[in-house]
Amino acid sequence: MTLWVLGLNHQTAPVDLRERAAFAGDALPRALDSLRILPQVREAALLSTCNRTELYAMADDPQTLVAWLDMHAPGLSGYLYQHRDAEAVRHLFRVATGLDSMVLGEPQILGQVKDAWAVARAHGALGSGLDRLFQQTFSVAKRARTDTRVGANPVSVASTAVRLAQESFARLNESTVLLVGAGETIELAAKHLSEGRVRRLLIANRTLAHAQTLATQHGGVALPLTELDRHLAEADVVFSATAAREPVVTRVQVEQALRTRKRKPMLLFDLAVPRDIEASVAELSDAYLYTVDDLERAVEDNRRSRREAADQAEAIIDLQVARYVETLQANERQAPLKRLRAFGDSTRDELLAKARQQLSNGKPADEVLEQLAHALTNRLLHPPTAALRDAALNNDLDLTSAADRLFPEKPGYRHPPVATPIVRTDDANPAP
């Protein structure tokens, strides 16, 4: 089995394609279930965020994985990147460390990788191979972020959006801000907004209790999502990041809100994939819509300033990839020995138990021992004997040469005879 990663991200695919490829809510467990039944796939995990969808798998053939992804979202194949074995390990280490993120060093991705691991594990999609890889990934990411400044004062997509809002509204503290959703991205936006102060903070969410929790923490007002129409016109700035499959803010809603506002400008940040705000909202005058792709350009300065720390983190990852691959190779070399030892031990235990049962049933010990010896010999030598017979028929010189090394001939060699004790008697000793 080979380790594969196939995926697309903000660098390889536009947002409309990424939102079609995303696995949100219950779609992720269902996708893992459909992967598990593929005979070519032994283990699998799915990482799905607003900026990437990636499939990690232990599988024979990547084309099976490509076909599965293309069935989920037709048209993906031309945008996919693909890594195997050591490069797949390196990719996951870089992703979890934040080196492959839109915002270099952003901290949220490590939690998202942990979530992907936890969901795959809970649904029985992980085996020892991927489980060990993810555990090592968490360790490497922690070390890279501890030993370098790649994670120092991280700039997230949410904080970048808040900064743009502050630059667009010189007096954001006199503005009303509406947050749609209550997940991690909205939590970060609420945190940054409360630090900078806003006149009024509205938080709308499908589950009102979650919105109330955020509102209590950051001095906002919680609203059920069903009341979005009534309050949208109050917002000077809107941040939206839900897990909905369809837009929660439509063009019709924004048009109505702008009329109510008497064309007073409205700034909207769509931080979700799939998108929360209909793309055609950008066509409306007085509505200024930013998507996650727009924010990538805004964070490029941050990426350059953190490049030195990233180079240090890359060096740590290079070392850890080499060590991880070396450990895997050592385990692979030991695997045949472990299987051979396990086969010998299980055969011995099975036949020994049978011999003991025969002894307890009163069978003569000599007969039991002879049968045990023959059975052990036959059981242990049958697999290599059959393999060597096939090798001879197929002219497999590698296997026959290996057998010569394993069982060398020693002409003239004989096992030393077992010494028989000499019992002296009076008759055997002549009289002096």
Swiss-Prot record:
Instruction: Provide the transmembrane region boundaries.
Output: none
The EC number of this protein is 1.2.1.70
- Give me the residues that bind substrate, please: 49-52, 101, 106-108, 112
The record's active-site residues are 50 (nucleophile)
Look up the signal peptide feature and give its range.
Answer: none
Domain notes from UniProt = Possesses an unusual extended V-shaped dimeric structure with each monomer consisting of three distinct domains arranged along a curved 'spinal' alpha-helix. The N-terminal catalytic domain specifically recognizes the glutamate moiety of the substrate. The second domain is the NADPH-binding domain, and the third C-terminal domain is responsible for dimerization.
Q: List the protein's name.
A: Glutamyl-tRNA reductase
UniProt organism field: Xanthomonas campestris pv. campestris (strain ATCC 33913 / DSM 3586 / NCPPB 528 / LMG 568 / P 25)
Lineage of origin: Bacteria, Pseudomonadati, Pseudomonadota, Gammaproteobacteria, Lysobacterales
GN (gene name): hemA
